[in-house]
Amino acid sequence: MNGVTLSKWNNRTHNRFAVLGMSGLGKTFLSTQLKKSKTWEHYSVDYEIGKILFTDKNSDFRNGFSINNLSNLSIFLGKPGNPSKGGIGFTEYIRRQRLHKQAEILATLKSSQLIQKTRYDNFICDTSGSICEIVNPSDPNDKILKTLSENFLIVCLEADNDTYETLIRRFTESPKPMYYEEPFLRMLWEKYLLKTNQDENKIDPDDFILYGYKALVERRKKLFYMISKNWGLSVNFNDIRKIKSGSDFVKLVKTQLNNKLVK
């Protein structure tokens, strides 16, 4: 596990965590529980992404955007397809995806710059659900993961299949724009065009988003598993739901870290 040893953990003088996982698995819940004590600093990568993106030409998206209301990020990304159904052209969709990627890289790396400057003792970096799409878990020199691991203990949230099915069901009821790795997105788009035999401007935006979501979930499960294996550790969604304080979370992490290091 890159950068983490039991002795290093036991001799630490701080609790600094980068929490990773798919949207809906409890990153924000955990951050909220830790902030209640007023002794934990919270850094939201999604909020920082918005601050980077919503300038100049995109300044209209700043209206109503806050750390407690991140919905404008999804609105900015949009969905490709029929304009009469709220869709945007695929070229514009790709442009926005690329802007999001650039902003996410900057916002994620900024968390490490902040901790180096402030040296907060209790700090949680609440990463974006798409962080797994901008890193290579198998590369020991991956810039983002290496930087995070040098400043935080990387904790990935995992869940059982029933929980993932619940995420899929909720998404089906209310599909929202997502960020995809570009080659994966283009592959999905081409397969969908062949499947439906439709022109791009006739595609139902929600139908395409739903088409790709289940494949995206399976992809991200594997990516987050590789991140936890190579760069940190994993904790279960059901255990996260029981967290009521920072000390609860620290105890859970210590247990999981010990379990991993003795294997």
Residue ranges and their predicted role:
Residues 19:
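Hydrophobic anchor at the beta1->P-loop junction of P-loop NTPases
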Residues 39-54:
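Short beta-strand-centered segment that lines the nucleotide-binding/catalytic pocket of NTP-utilizing
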Residues 59-139:
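ATP-dependent small-molecule kinase phosphotransfer cores
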Residues 197-263:
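NTP-dependent small-molecule kinase module
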Residues 23:
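The conserved Walker
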Residues 30, 34:
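Hydrophobic positions on the alpha1 helix immediately C-terminal to the Walker A/P-loop
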Residues 26:
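Conserved glycine(s) of the Walker
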Residues 126, 146-197:
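Conserved phosphate-donor/acceptor-positioning beta-strand/loop module used by diverse small-molecule
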